[in-house]
């Protein structure tokens, strides 16, 4: 089988979960993005690309629910995993605290333009969404945005940049993703894999 693993904060926990299910992940050469052991092949990808790889043919992947929601990829999601817990929230400068319902005309910086647009559309609030790929929390400080939508774990990064959380959009955790065709073609193998993960993680 082919597995796609996310770079960054979910990587080590993803390997642990696979190994609990009996999938041995061989040591990766530092520069290798694809590696394997003859039985399974592993691909290392940007977290935002994992659902896309799974939708388009990689058998199994692990990604945050934030990324899956943002991408809207058509994948089978059999399990929520017990790591990667955080939240996607709206934050503003601490001296300009405003509820989302009063953000009409605001510029919002985020890596999550689709989720952000949907959230404010549901509130009937018109905002301008500015897509950035990193250091989102700097946008209000340098004057290019009035607020941000970003992942919050402890809130330390927000505080150190003079920002406060004003609303939670969604809770986030890691998800197991399965390609829909693979799920049918390798039903027994994938079902056994899912069962092993569920038992090792949740005990049932």
Curated annotation (Swiss-Prot):
In Pfam terms, one family for this protein is HisG
UniProt KW Manganese keyword: no
Which pathway, metabolic or otherwise, does it act in? Amino-acid biosynthesis; L-histidine biosynthesis; L-histidine from 5-phospho-alpha-D-ribose 1-diphosphate: step 1/9
Query: Which InterPro entries does the UniProt record give?
Result: ATP_PRibTrfase_cat (IPR013820), ATP_PRibTrfase_CS (IPR018198), ATP_PRibTrfase_HisG (IPR001348), ATP_PRibTrfase_HisG_short (IPR024893)
Its UniProt entry gives the catalysed reaction(s) as: 1-(5-phospho-beta-D-ribosyl)-ATP + diphosphate = 5-phospho-alpha-D-ribose 1-diphosphate + ATP
What keywords were assigned to this record? Amino-acid biosynthesis, ATP-binding, Cytoplasm, Glycosyltransferase, Histidine biosynthesis, Nucleotide-binding, Transferase
Q: Where would one find the signal peptide in this protein?
A: none
Q: Which GO terms describe its molecular function?
A: ATP binding; ATP phosphoribosyltransferase activity
Write out the GO cellular component annotations.
cytoplasm
Q: What Enzyme Commission number(s) appear in the record?
A: 2.4.2.17
User: Could you state one GO biological process linked to this protein?
Assistant: L-histidine biosynthetic process
Q: Which residues form a coiled coil?
A: none
Q: Which residues cross the membrane?
A: none
The record's subcellular locations are: Cytoplasm
Function (record text): Catalyzes the condensation of ATP and 5-phosphoribose 1-diphosphate to form N'-(5'-phosphoribosyl)-ATP (PR-ATP). Has a crucial role in the pathway because the rate of histidine biosynthesis seems to be controlled primarily by regulation of HisG enzymatic activity.
Membership in a protein family: Belongs to the ATP phosphoribosyltransferase family. Short subfamily.
Q: What is this protein called?
A: ATP phosphoribosyltransferase
What organism does the UniProt record list as the source?
A: Pyrococcus furiosus (strain ATCC 43587 / DSM 3638 / JCM 8422 / Vc1)
Per UniProt, what is the name of the gene that codes for the protein in this document?
hisG
